[in-house]
From Swiss-Prot:
HAMAP family for this protein: Proteasome_A_B (MF_00289_B)
Any one GO molecular function term: threonine-type endopeptidase activity
Annotated function: Component of the proteasome core, a large protease complex with broad specificity involved in protein degradation.
GO terms under cellular component: cytoplasm; proteasome core complex, alpha-subunit complex
Designated name of the protein: Proteasome subunit alpha
Self-association and partners: The 20S proteasome core is composed of 14 alpha and 14 beta subunits that assemble into four stacked heptameric rings, resulting in a barrel-shaped structure. The two inner rings, each composed of seven catalytic beta subunits, are sandwiched by two outer rings, each composed of seven alpha subunits. The catalytic chamber with the active sites is on the inside of the barrel. Has a gated structure, the ends of the cylinder being occluded by the N-termini of the alpha-subunits. Is capped by the proteasome-associated ATPase, ARC.
PROSITE patterns in the cross-refs: PROTEASOME_ALPHA_2 (PS51475)
Family: Belongs to the peptidase T1A family.
Pfam family, one: Proteasome
Localization per Swiss-Prot or TrEMBL: Cytoplasm
Length: 258
């Protein structure tokens, strides 16, 4: 007689955790940090169409790492929920905390009830309205539904330890946009392979996806930073991306958020 397969609940949870962590670590890193005018998103992403960073609602942004199809379905669900609540009540009733809690509940349910967890990690960022005091909050939601709020920076995906170490050394509250972009990109470049080639790693402008949430904007705070503006920001801040031009005057074009 063949005995049925048995695994303890603890072993099943450990296996799920290991699977999710490995899936997230295979991706490229994303840095989300606060600066003097709001929130900055910087993702290492060579794709021009498959975004890791996007807008959820008027004052709320979204960043994710892991399996694209999984976090894209979560992003679309968050947009739908935000639009529905804003339509039924008031646009100011849509908050980052409510969306972060909804994501945490959804991910926790999948992790506990399904055989395979989502291999994703999410950051929901929110800024206040222009008339409010400067304030930004970052909600980090893990694959198992664990949620933590941060006030300075969040690092997700890839090899996070060297990036976190670099940010702890270089990040300061109240950085301007140019300095914040430089700090984030230099931290991402610190995540290269160990050994002699570690210091030689550079990330070109074409491999970066950058966006901001600006509290001073009247309604929709989210906007993307174009490649040209990003190149000027990096060159003006002295960051080596191997594609620089000597110019430091930067004006971000007004572009509709996606």
């Amino acid at each position: 007689m063949t005995l049925p397969y048995y695994a303890s609940a603890e072993q099943i949870m450990r296996d799920k955790t290991e699977l999710a962590r490995k899936g997230i670590a295979r991706g490229r890193s994303v840095v989300v940090l606060t600066y003097d005018k709001g929130v900055l998103f910087v993702a290492e992403n060579p794709s021009a169409t498959l975004h890791k960073v996007s807008e959820l609602y008027d004052r709320i942004g979204f960043a994710a790492v892991g399996k694209y199809n999984e976090f894209e379905s979560l992003r679309r669900g968050g947009i739908l929920q935000a639009d529905l609540r804003g339509y039924q009540y008031d646009r100011r009733d849509v908050t980052g905390r409510a969306l972060a809690n909804a994501y945490a509940q959804a991910l926790g349910t999948v992790f506990n009830d399904q055989l395979k967890p989502f291999e994703v990690e999410i950051c929901v960022a929110e800024v206040g309205y222009p008339e409010q005091s400067p304030e930004a909050v970052l909600y980090r939601i893990n694959f198992d539904g664990a949620i933590v709020d941060e006030r300075e920076f969040v690092v997700m995906g890839g090899t996070t330890e060297p990036i976190v170490a670099a940010l702890k050394d270089s990040y300061q509250p109240g950085l301007d946009l140019s300095s914040a972009v430089g700090v984030a990109v230099q931290a991402l470049q610190a995540s290269g392979p160990e050994g002699a080639d570690k210091e030689k790693r550079t990330i070109g402008v074409s491999q970066l996806e950058v966006a901001t949430l600006e509290q001073a904007r009247p309604r929709r705070a989210f906007r993307r930073v174009t490649k040209t503006a990003l190149e000027q920001l990096l060159v003006g801040n002295g960051v080596d991306t191997s594609v620089g031009k000597a110019t430091t005057t930067v004006e971000l074009p007004e572009e509709p958020a996606e």
